[in-house]
């Protein structure tokens, strides 16, 4: 018989993460690399594990992630979002705790575009009155 798999898609900034949860030992694999190898920052690894901490399911599922776009922070946020959505498939009762922790909400903040005539999105050259 096939093993149960739960899928979820997460997005953050320019990153898109496709997440699969399989009952297992808690091993996280991102783009066929171990999480410690793929994401060098410990605080971002904590971000990825947040949904498991909130639902107290640490070590219950192996996580397989395919993530594209963005940098470390965006990808970590996308993975967290994807794991949260996949955990909803596992048990719909998790919705309350995940929603309260704000893990089901897609973070809509994006980089503001650079405007013509300015140096950056908002940085202008110094204004001279005279």
Curated annotation (Swiss-Prot):
Query: What Gene3D superfamilies is this protein classified in?
Result: 3.30.230.10
InterPro entries the UniProt entry points to: Ribosomal_Su5_D2-typ_SF, Ribosomal_uS9, Ribosomal_uS9_bac/plastid, Ribosomal_uS9_CS, Ribsml_uS5_D2-typ_fold_subgr
State if Magnesium is listed as a keyword: no
Gene Ontology cellular-component terms for this entry are:
cytosolic small ribosomal subunit
Annotated GO molecular function terms are: RNA binding; structural constituent of ribosome
BP term (GO), one: translation
Which PANTHER family would you find in this protein's record? RIBOSOMAL PROTEIN S9 (PTHR21569), SMALL RIBOSOMAL SUBUNIT PROTEIN US9M (PTHR21569:SF1)
The UniProt family comment states: Belongs to the universal ribosomal protein uS9 family.
NCBIfam families listed in its UniProt record = PRK00132.1 (NF001099)
- For this entry, the protein name equals Small ribosomal subunit protein uS9
Q: What is the protein's species of origin? A: Streptococcus agalactiae serotype V (strain ATCC BAA-611 / 2603 V/R)
């Amino acid at each position: 018989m096939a093993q149960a798999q739960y899928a979820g898609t997460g997005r953050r900034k320019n990153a898109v993460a496709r997440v699969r949860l399989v009952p297992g030992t808690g091993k996280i694999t991102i783009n066929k690399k171990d999480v410690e190898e793929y994401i060098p920052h410990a605080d971002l690894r904590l971000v990825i594990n947040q949904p498991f901490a909130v639902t107290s399911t640490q070590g219950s599922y192996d996580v397989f992630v395919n993530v594209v776009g963005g940098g470390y922070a965006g990808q970590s946020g996308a993975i967290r979002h994807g794991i949260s959505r996949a955990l909803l498939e596992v048990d719909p009762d998790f919705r309350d705790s995940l929603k309260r922790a704000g893990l089901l909400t897609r973070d809509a903040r994006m980089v503001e575009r650079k405007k013509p005539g300015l140096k950056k999105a908002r940085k202008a050259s110094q204004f001279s009155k005279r």
